[in-house]
């Protein structure tokens, strides 16, 4: 039995930090575990310009606790809209701080109202991204109300993603937080210009977790949890050693009152034990030897960034996740609140 894991410090390639006091509450959880994180731009006022991305980055860095200063690098993204210009993409690329552009279909998830209503309106901008090798990060769900919510990812592949890649074959794309066997098979079958992130919660939970023992709002996220066959396909992909599947938590904190309400928000907070969760998942699959590559190598390799040189260690030691944590003056219920985790940072 392995009692200690020491490996290259990982990165989180999909993270929601929020802003202000809320960000100050959750940022240390990520910065203690990860060297870098790809910061999502869907604030209440979306990050749509390079100038806004630079200002947000400065706020993140200033919010780091003193003991973590210099140990964490936020990687910034822009929020793609119908009116994002090719010139803005050029500015973003030249800035050196914007690493990617995020596509949210309008209405697909939290703070996505300003997202893209028709991908054809972005043709010139996407062409510039292809030319400059600026990656596109995709929330892969259609928002057609006629499509069943459990099929939105599968339909997105056929309706949006395949035509997009045919039109822009040189565009680098990350299929974010995949949740289905179809998404796994698509990434495996396509060129090396497309990769996918996989969350801890989609690896651990299937859609039964939404309803077992009553409605469970803290397990509600978008894309929603899927059938067990899809969870198993995700675990197989994450632990396969395939270099185009890598870690992205999609950790998305919301106040307790916004989760336990008549119209609850989508999002699961996992940053408090993210790498520990992944270690559990890989251990259960008998693939602890492949955790380092998934968490620390494949992401930077795909983005053309250097791998981290420092290390972290996890000990085989059980600890209990608190039932609630402070969140910018509110309370937050973390993933697996009150439960034991068998690895400890």
Curated annotation (Swiss-Prot):
Organism: Nitrosomonas eutropha (strain DSM 101675 / C91 / Nm57)
GO MF term set: dihydroorotase activity; zinc ion binding
EC main group: hydrolase
Family classification: Belongs to the metallo-dependent hydrolases superfamily. DHOase family. Class II DHOase subfamily.
Gene3D superfamilies assigned: Metal-dependent hydrolases (3.20.20.140)
CC annotations in GO: cytosol
HAMAP family: PyrC_classII
Enzyme Commission numbers on file: 3.5.2.3
PROSITE patterns listed in its UniProt record: DIHYDROOROTASE_1 (PS00482), DIHYDROOROTASE_2 (PS00483)
Purpose: Catalyzes the reversible cyclization of carbamoyl aspartate to dihydroorotate.
Protein's UniProt name: Dihydroorotase
């Amino acid at each position: 039995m392995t009692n200690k894991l020491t490996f290259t410090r990982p990165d989180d390639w999909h993270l929601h930090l929020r802003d202000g006091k809320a960000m100050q509450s959750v940022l240390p959880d990520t910065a203690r575990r990860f060297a870098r994180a790809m910061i999502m731009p869907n604030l209440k006022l979306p990050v749509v310009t390079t100038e806004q991305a630079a200002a947000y980055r400065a706020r993140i860095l200033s919010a780091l606790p003193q003991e973590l200063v210099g140990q964490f690098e936020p990687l910034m993204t822009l929020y793609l809209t119908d009116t994002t210009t090719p010139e803005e993409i050029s500015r973003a690329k030249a800035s050196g701080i914007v690493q990617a552009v995020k596509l949210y279909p309008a209405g697909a998830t939290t703070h996505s109202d300003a997202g893209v209503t028709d991908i054809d309106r972005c043709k010139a901008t996407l062409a510039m991204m292809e030319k400059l090798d600026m990656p596109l990060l995709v929330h892969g769900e259609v928002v057609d109300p006629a499509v069943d919510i459990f099929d939105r990812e599968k339909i997105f592949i056929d309706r949006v993603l395949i035509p997009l890649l045919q039109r822009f074959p040189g565009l680098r794309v990350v299929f974010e937080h995949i949740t289905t066997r179809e998404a796994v098979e698509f990434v495996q079958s396509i060129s090396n210009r497309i990769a996918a992130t996989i969350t801890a919660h989609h690896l651990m939970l299937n859609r039964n977790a939404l309803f077992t023992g009553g409605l469970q709002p803290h397990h509600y996220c978008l894309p929603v949890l899927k059938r067990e066959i899809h969870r198993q396909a995700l675990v197989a992909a994450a632990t396969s050693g395939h270099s185009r599947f890598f870690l992205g938590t999609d950790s998305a904190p919301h106040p307790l009152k916004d989760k336990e309400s008549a119209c609850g928000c989508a999002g699961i907070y996992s940053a408090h034990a993210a790498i520990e969760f992944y270690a559990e998942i890989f251990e259960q699959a008998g693939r602890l030897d492949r955790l380092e590559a998934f968490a620390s190598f494949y992401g930077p390799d795909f983005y053309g960034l250097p791998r981290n040189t420092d290390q972290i260690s996890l000990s085989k030691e059980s600890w209990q996740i608190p039932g609630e944590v402070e969140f910018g003056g509110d309370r937050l219920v973390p993933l697996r609140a009150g439960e034991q985790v068998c690895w400890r940072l």
